[in-house]
Design a protein with these regions (language model features):
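A structured beta-alpha segment of the ubiquitous adenosine-cofactor-binding alpha/beta core
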Residues: 302-330, 338-342
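Glycine-rich phosphate-binding loop and adjoining beta1-alpha1-beta2 segment
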Residues: 271-311
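Glycine-rich phosphate/adenylate-binding loop
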Residues: 67-211, 330-333, 337-474
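Ser/Thr/Pro-rich, low-complexity mucin-like regions
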Residues: 35-53
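N-terminal charged helix/coil linker that caps or initiates catalytic domains
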Residues: 185-243, 267
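Short, glycine/acidic-rich hinge or "gate" loops at secondary-structure transitions
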Residues: 51-63
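Glycine-rich adenosine-cofactor-binding loop
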Residues: 235-269, 273-281
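Compact alpha/beta protein-protein interaction domains typified by the UBC
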Residues: 1-20
Length: 474
């Protein structure tokens, strides 16, 4: 067989079924084994007939093993890059970045300390998807790399060679070359042999000795905020770059803020504002995103601290005040996660259209979770829904919501429901926020029925503003 063929790894193993795509019947081992052998025979036959060569591009990383290098790049700039070197358990880790302070913050969260060392690093771009050479693989020298790249993109090959020779002129001991392709980012390290270079200078050898330099494949691991937010929602926009305020960091808002950050909020120049004047008490912990270490802390400040711990580069502003005294500035999206009806009405009046407003709340003792987004003057606001509910319209359940209170005395009473209900409300809010940023605001009113003993009264819909609403008919 050639040095590199599709579906055969470096260890000689044959990949005939993608991992995780087939469920084998453990109660039919003989039949399943025969089916696997039949599939493996079919794949191997196609390989021997010279087919499936195109699969080499999709499987490139299976043929490209090497030292891990972490890349935290938000810009598209090519050329020389900044590389931080970290010592961890006696080994060196490399982090390529376009923002040293941002990446250093991430490294501090891991307990890593940046050294004063650096590595000459270059970034080049190609139009070709990588695929291994079937004649000679893996590449061991610069000559092998250049021969390989000439079959993919001759222009990129020239750029790579120029950067390697530039590192030689700068008397570097080694350099990292990263190649941005349409499919992925991959790279390799070049090791400069100073003995050959000194001999070349002494005897005025005109040959280009860079072809003999040893290389080592580099496995690129992306840790940039854009990749982390978008990997699980490909082909969709994230919340990166948006100014978003979450009012209420309680049982809904805490989980919601966490999910929003995972969806890109507070990155790429955007900001996440958390507003809550309340503190965390023991009775809150059972259904709150925060825990015992945050006891008696302000919810907005503690949640901000927790999110920075999880995502060190996130831009968060905590406002431990009543939202009625807060200055939120220009917003792309306002989210009311307080579940307080009167405050929700005030927010609708104080932040009218064109500021998009998303309200998320829990109905009854966890009977249902609902969310309403207002993006147009013709659409209903949160106050409109109150008028409709009074007339028996747009309700969540056919039956009246049960009134269940727990606790002792007037000050200790509360509506009981588990944390799972809070998470479902936060999930619905995140879903609608992502739909909003992707231009989908319908249905504007969404309900997720949790209590299966109840009957859903209102399917997801787009309610118009209510004629009785004093805010929409002012």
């Amino acid at each position: 067989l050639p040095a590199a063929v599709p579906h055969i790894g470096a260890d000689g193993g044959l990949c005939y079924i993608a991992k995780g795509t087939v469920v084998l019947d453990i109660y039919d081992p003989v039949g399943q084994s025969l089916a696997c052998l039949e599939r493996a025979t079919s794949v191997l036959g196609q390989i021997l007939n010279g087919r499936l060569v195109e699969d080499l591009a999709e499987e490139f990383f299976a043929y490209w093993h090497g030292l891990f290098c972490f890349v935290d790049m938000q810009s598209k700039d090519l050329g020389e890059q900044n590389c931080l070197v970290v010592q961890e358990n006696g080994r060196s880790l490399y982090f390529v970045t376009d923002d040293e302070s941002r990446t250093t913050g991430k490294l501090k969260s891991l307990g890593y300390k940046v050294t004063d060392k650096t590595v000459l690093t270059y970034r080049v771009k190609t139009k070709a998807q990588p695929r291994p050479l079937t004649s000679h693989w893996p590449p061991e020298t610069v000559g092998d790399i250049l021969e390989w790249q000439s079959t993919l993109d001759p222009q990129c090959r020239r750029k790579i060679h120029e950067r390697i020779k530039e590192g030689e002129r700068r008397k570097a001991n080694g350099s990292l070359i990263f190649i941005e392709s349409p499919l992925m980012t991959y790279g390799f390290a070049v090791f400069y042999d100073r003995r050959h270079l000194l001999r070349k200078k002494k005897f005025v050898d005109r040959r280009d000795l860079s072809y003999r330099l040893k290389v080592m494949p580099i496995s690129v691991v992306r840790i940039d905020d854009g990749y982390l937010a978008q990997r699980n929602i490909p082909n969709s926009k994230t919340l990166a770059g948006k100014n978003i305020a979450v009012v209420g960091c309680g049982t809904i808002g805490g989980y919601l803020a966490d999910m929003l950050v995972k969806a890109g909020a507070g990155t790429f120049g955007g900001k996440l504002i958390l507003v809550d004047f309340d503190s965390l008490f023991p009775q809150n912990i059972g259904r709150h995103r925060l825990g015992f270490p945050d006891l008696l802390s302000n919810k907005a400040e503690a949640m901000s601290k927790e999110l920075r711990r999880l995502t060190p580069s996130v831009e968060i502003r905590a406002l431990p005040v009543d939202v009625r005294q807060a200055q939120l500035g220009k917003l792309d999206l306002l989210i009311d996660a307080t579940g307080e009806e009167s405050l929700g009405h005030w927010l609708c009046g104080h932040y009218p259209h064109p500021t998009p407003m998303l309200s998320v709340w829990i109905e009854g003792p966890g009977t249902a979770v609902r969310a309403l987004i207002r993006t147009t003057t013709s659409g209903a606001c949160y106050r409109c829904l109150w008028h409709s509910n009074r007339r028996g319209e747009l309700r969540s359940t056919v039956e009246p919501l049960p009134v269940i209170l727990a606790g002792h005395g007037c000050e200790g009473l509360y509506v009981p429901f588990p944390a799972s209900v809070s998470v479902q409300a936060a999930s619905l809010g995140t879903e609608m926020a992502l739909d909003w940023v992707n231009g989908t605001n319908s249905p504007a009113l969404r309900t997720r029925l949790i209590d299966r003993t109840k009957q859903l009264a209102t399917p997801d819909c787009d309610p118009c503003h209510d004629p009785e609403c004093p805010l929409c008919n002012f």
